[in-house]
A protein has these predicted regions:
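Ser/Thr-glycine-rich phosphate-binding loops at phosphate-binding pockets of nucleotides
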Residues: 115-121
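Histidine-anchored nucleotide/phosphate-binding helix
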Residues: 121-131
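Short, conserved phosphate/pyrophosphate- and ester-handling motifs at nucleotide-, phospho-/glycolipid
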Residues: 35, 118, 221
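Ferredoxin-reductase
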Residues: 2-85
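Reductase modules of NAD(P)H-dependent flavoproteins
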Residues: 2-3, 141, 148-257
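Conserved beta-strand elements of the Class I
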Residues: 110-113, 217
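Short, Lys/Arg- and Gly-enriched loop/turn segments at beta-strand edges
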Residues: 46-53, 96-104
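Generic structural signal for buried aliphatic residues
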Residues: 38, 89-92
Length: 257
């Protein structure tokens, strides 16, 4: 029995010349938790060429969605960026990952800290009703170089608050904090610097990080992961695992290149 399903591309959207989103059909046997990633790819010379991708879509949706960078000489992304509606993509049948609420201890506030395509798993998490039942407040932080790379900005700010089922919870409980490093924008700076200086908390009118109340998920570049891990551990946060819940979790299966 194959470890993969063949799915058909339903839509493709290019945010910039370096970033794109695509959706595919979803095999009815595909099961995952919000925050999971899976292996996806293309057949090249009859062999699967695969990489780990977080699933953007929520686990109750009838399609799958992924967010990808474009690497000109990347073995997979150099090909994947040219996919069109109707093309076939291979999707792994065994999603996994550490960015699950189950791996966090109970708390009042959940911080979702991302850079670049690290936003992807958090898009499914903020569309999960259980997220808002588990936490009083959810803070989505997305750091990018240029403002056009703020994928899903309009979905988060305009469409989700109007969502038929989630709109009320999202309107009351979700805070969105986009930041840009290389262009003029209302919030500028690296996520780590904005946290270390306290500016992020001032901007959001929130108290400083407190292990008694706050829980954190992190997905992004290797440097950002390490810097935030150090920052949190200095504040006595303990990292959670699949076997022992903690105060923060990190997705290490991939980091954007």
């Amino acid at each position: 029995m194959s470890a993969f399903n063949e799915e058909r591309v339903l839509s493709v959207h290019h945010w910039t010349d370096k970033l794109f989103t695509f959706t595919t059909t979803r095999d009815e046997t595909m099961r995952f938790s919000n925050g999971h990633f899976t292996m996806i790819g293309l057949k090249v010379n009859d062999k699967p060429l695969l990489r780990a991708y977080s699933i953007v879509s929520a686990n109750y949706e009838d399609h799958l969605e992924f967010l990808s960078i474009k690497v000109p000489d990347g073995p997979l992304t150099s090909r994947l960026q040219h996919i069109k509606v109707g093309d076939t993509v291979i999707v792994g049948k065994k999603p996994t990952g550490t960015l699950l609420i189950d791996y966090l201890l109970p708390g009042k506030r959940l911080y979702l800290l991302s850079t670049g395509t690290g936003l992807a798993p958090f898009m499914s998490i903020i569309r999960d009703p259980e997220t808002y039942e588990a936490f009083e407040q959810v803070v989505l932080v997305h750091g990018v170089r240029e403002k056009d790379e703020l994928a899903y900005h309009d979905l988060v700010t305009e469409h989700l608050p109007q969502h038929e089922f989630l709109g009320e919870m999202i309107g009351k409980q979700l805070l969105y904090y986009p930041t840009v490093t290389r262009e003029s924008y209302r919030t500028m700076g690296r996520v780590t610097d904005l946290m270390a200086s306290g500016q992020m908390f001032d901007d959001l009118k929130l108290p400083a990080l407190d292990v008694a109340n706050d829980r954190v998920m992190i997905c992004g570049s290797p440097g950002m992961l390490q810097d935030l891990k150090t920052m949190l551990e200095d504040k006595l946060f303990k990292e959670g695992t699949t076997s022992k819940p903690g105060d923060f979790v990190i997705e290490r299966a991939f980091a954007e290149k």
